[in-house]
A protein has these predicted regions:
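C-terminal partner/receptor-binding element of secreted or periplasmic proteins
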Residues: 120-151
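A residue-level detector for conformationally permissive "hinge/kink" positions
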Residues: 9-12, 100, 135
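N-terminal export/targeting and maturation segments
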Residues: 2-80
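Generic alpha-helical propensity signal that fires on short helical segments
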Residues: 19, 84-89, 122, 128
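Compositionally biased, low-complexity repeat tracts
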Residues: 13-14, 82, 116, 139
Length: 151
């Protein structure tokens, strides 16, 4: 009986150790998750600006601290985003529906990122990656074409 209990205990210890090792090896501590609420707000505001003929101010939708935005064309490889940022891009997006917008702090670190989930597209910006200052992140939407507002 004692041998059986020792064998069961050893098997359980190995199982728990194996699970802990699997979790440790597959963890992704540095991944930056997409801000779903911000993505939905931006997508809704694009549709509203198109319908109402109003401007879309990204700074008003994202009122927290950030200084620049990168507008990333769909299908842009992570390696290209990493080159532009100057460090590895670890953004996690379950599925890509449109352009990614990466909000950067003054030091170049990522504040947050969102993805545009509507039927429109960005126009009048550099591809595959455009950079705009916060003050320039005001857009006109016409026929679901999102373009920076002329200053």
């Amino acid at each position: 009986m004692t041998r059986a209990l020792i064998a069961v205990g050893a098997a359980l210890a190995l199982l728990v150790g194996g699970l802990a090792l699997a979790v440790f090896l597959t963890r992704d501590e540095d991944g930056i998750q997409v801000d779903n609420l911000l993505s939905e707000d931006f997508t809704r505001e694009v549709a509203s600006a198109d319908t109402n003929g109003t401007d879309l101010d990204l700074g008003a939708i994202a009122p927290f601290e950030w200084s620049r935005v990168l507008v990333i064309q769909p299908g842009t490889p992570d390696a290209e985003i990493s080159r532009r940022l100057g460090y590895e891009w670890t953004g996690v997006l379950g599925f890509e529906t449109g352009e990614k917008l990466i909000l950067l702090n003054r030091d170049g670190s990522v504040s947050r990122f969102l993805d545009y989930r509507g039927n429109g597209r960005f126009g009048g910006v550099e591809t595959p990656i455009a950079e705009l200052a916060r003050d320039d992140a005001v857009f006109r939407v016409d026929g679901l074409v999102i373009t920076p507002k002329e200053r």
